């Protein structure tokens, strides 16, 4: 029994030793393979100073950039900015990282902390962040000739100065500008790798309210107190899709104007109906005007195209309400004039009788005076009183004629002319409005 256990133990020991020998040989072969295909990072960075740029003290580092625009998630008129997610790729030469062997190899993103990288920042950026899911979205790749590729995935909110005077028929020009934070033109020079072809993705974007008309790249210089810096500029034009606003604002406001014209076909005597239509359309237009401004900046420097149109519509709606007030007032004046005509005839008869009686009284007094002529016995008070009443009547008649000159003789004509003039003037206003804002 002891002999059998001893034999089994010896066999197990021999098997274990054999496996260890094979494993060590495999590790040696793998290690040799790694050394042949990839340079040792520790050997490559031996004596490497990440705080000094390549060619330190010599020619500036040439950094070539490319951009992929993944998305433009929002464009805010109220904040005057846009938010975009971009893939930023930078390439430069670092002679300290030249190696022999394979064409290139990719390092773990955490090793970027041991290398020199440009201090590129986004000009006019309000806030930016680097994506960290599931790890930091960074890539570092080394090429055998010393070229370094450094890629980042960034979401940034960038300021964009907008001219909203033609809103919503406007075209906005926004920029994405890249520049070195600390290295001026003597240390770092930025360039686009392939000109306009250095930017990709914009032509495939689909935005809610905009269409990207065109874009182009520029290389400019930024003169600041700390030096002269190279700045890369991506400039793109955004044309707003006006169809959305036509359906949301222009069509409802136009329908409200047309609805206000319905009152022209309603009788002047239907006071509640016409008043209700006028007040309702005015309040609806006011609500529409307030709602159109909720998503826009509350500044006094912009009189937008949509404000002009809503102002025109409000003027026509309010004008229709005033038209009924004028027509109804004229109707009341006409009825009052008829009553005054009847009263006038009665007053004329009364004045004639008064004058005749005054003349008769005067004649009688003259006959009495023929018996005994005495100026003290003649009484002119009755005649003077009746004559002043006549002057008052003549004055009222003159004033009445002046008022009648400015009074509408036939109130029904007000509605008749309004049926033609309101639609005609509104159509002419639309022609001038759309021609100006679409083509000028």
UniProtKB/Swiss-Prot annotation:
Known glycosylation sites: 43, 102, 145, 196, 228
Gene3D superfamilies on file: Neurotransmitter-gated ion-channel ligand-binding domain, Neurotransmitter-gated ion-channel transmembrane domain
Signal sequence residues: 1-23
Membrane topology recorded in Swiss-Prot or TrEMBL: Multi-pass membrane protein
Tissues expressing the protein: Most abundant in non-neuronal tissues including the uterus, ovaries and also expressed in lung, thymus and prostate. Expressed in the hippocampus.
Effect of residue 416 to R: In a breast cancer sample; somatic mutation
Residue ranges that the UniProt entry lists as topological domain Cytoplasmic: 263-270, 323-419
Localization: Cell membrane; Apical cell membrane
Keyword Nucleotidyltransferase: no
UniProt keyword Kinase present: no
InterPro entries: GABAA/Glycine_rcpt, GABAAp_rcpt, GABAAR_pi_TM, Neur_chan_lig-bd, Neur_chan_lig-bd_sf, Neur_channel, Neuro-gated_channel_TM_sf, Neuro_actylchol_rec
Keywords per UniProt: Cell membrane, Chloride, Chloride channel, Disulfide bond, Glycoprotein, Ion channel, Ion transport, Membrane, Signal, Transmembrane, Transmembrane helix, Transport
Listed Pfam families: Neur_chan_LBD, Neur_chan_memb
GO cellular component, one term: GABA-A receptor complex
Subunit composition and interactions: Heteropentamer, formed by a combination of alpha (GABRA1-6), beta (GABRB1-3), gamma (GABRG1-3), delta (GABRD), epsilon (GABRE), rho (GABRR1-3), pi (GABRP) and theta (GABRQ) chains, each subunit exhibiting distinct physiological and pharmacological properties.
PANTHER family in the cross-refs: NEUROTRANSMITTER GATED ION CHANNEL
Family assignment from sequence similarity: Belongs to the ligand-gated ion channel (TC 1.A.9) family. Gamma-aminobutyric acid receptor (TC 1.A.9.5) subfamily. GABRP sub-subfamily.
Domain notes: GABAARs subunits share a common topological structure: a peptide sequence made up of a long extracellular N-terminal, four transmembrane domains, intracellular or cytoplasmic domain located between the third and the fourth transmembrane domains.
Protein's recorded name: Gamma-aminobutyric acid receptor subunit pi
Organism lineage: Eukaryota, Metazoa, Chordata, Craniata, Vertebrata
Gene: GABRP
């Amino acid at each position: 029994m002891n002999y059998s256990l001893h034999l089994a133990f010896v066999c197990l020991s021999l098997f274990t030793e054999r496996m260890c020998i094979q494993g060590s040989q495999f590790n040696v072969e793998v290690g040799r393979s790694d050394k042949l295909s990839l340079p040792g990072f520790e050997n490559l960075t031996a004596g490497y100073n990440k705080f000094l740029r390549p060619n330190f003290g010599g020619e500036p580092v040439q950094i070539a950039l490319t951009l992929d625009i993944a998305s433009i998630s929002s464009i805010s008129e109220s904040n005057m900015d846009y938010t975009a997610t971009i893939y930023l790729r930078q390439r430069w030469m670092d002679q300290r990282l030249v190696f022999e062997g394979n064409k290139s190899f990719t390092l773990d993103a955490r090793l970027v902390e041991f290398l020199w990288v440009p201090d590129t920042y986004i000009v006019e950026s309000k806030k930016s962040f680097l994506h960290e899911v599931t790890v930091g979205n960074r890539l570092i790749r080394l090429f055998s000739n010393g070229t370094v590729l450094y890629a980042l995935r960034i979401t940034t909110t960038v300021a964009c100065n907008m001219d909203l005077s033609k809103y919503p028929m406007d075209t906005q020009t926004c920029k994405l500008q890249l520049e070195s934070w600390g290295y001026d033109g003597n240390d770092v020079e930025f360039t686009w790798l392939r000109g306009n072809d250095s930017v990709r993705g914009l032509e495939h974007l689909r935005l809610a309210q905009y269409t990207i008309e065109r874009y182009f790249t520029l290389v400019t210089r930024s003169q600041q107190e700390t030096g002269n810096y190279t700045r890369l500029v991506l400039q793109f034009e955004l044309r707003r899709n006006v169809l959305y606003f036509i359906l949301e604002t222009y069509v409802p406001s136009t329908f409200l104007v047309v609805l206000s014209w319905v009152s022209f076909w309603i009788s002047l005597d239907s006071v509640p109906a016409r008043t209700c239509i006028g007040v309702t359309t005015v309040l609806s237009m006011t609500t529409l005007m307030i709602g159109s401004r909720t998503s826009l900046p509350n500044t006094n420097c912009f009189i937008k195209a949509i404000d002009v149109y809503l102002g025109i519509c409000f003027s026509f709606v309010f004008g229709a309400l005033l038209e009924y007030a004028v027509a109804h007032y004229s109707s009341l004046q006409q009825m009052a004039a008829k009553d005054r005509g009847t009263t006038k005839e009665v007053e004329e008869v009364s004045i004639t009788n008064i004058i005749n009686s005054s003349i008769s009284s005067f004649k009688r007094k003259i006959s009495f005076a023929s018996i005994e002529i005495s100026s003290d016995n003649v009484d002119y008070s009755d005649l003077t009183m009746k004559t002043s009443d006549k002057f008052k009547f003549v004055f009222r008649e003159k004033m009445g004629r002046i008022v009648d000159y400015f009074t509408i003789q036939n109130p029904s004509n007000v509605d008749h002319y309004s049926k033609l003039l309101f639609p005609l003037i509104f159509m002419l206003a639309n022609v001038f409005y759309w021609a100006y804002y679409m083509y000028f």
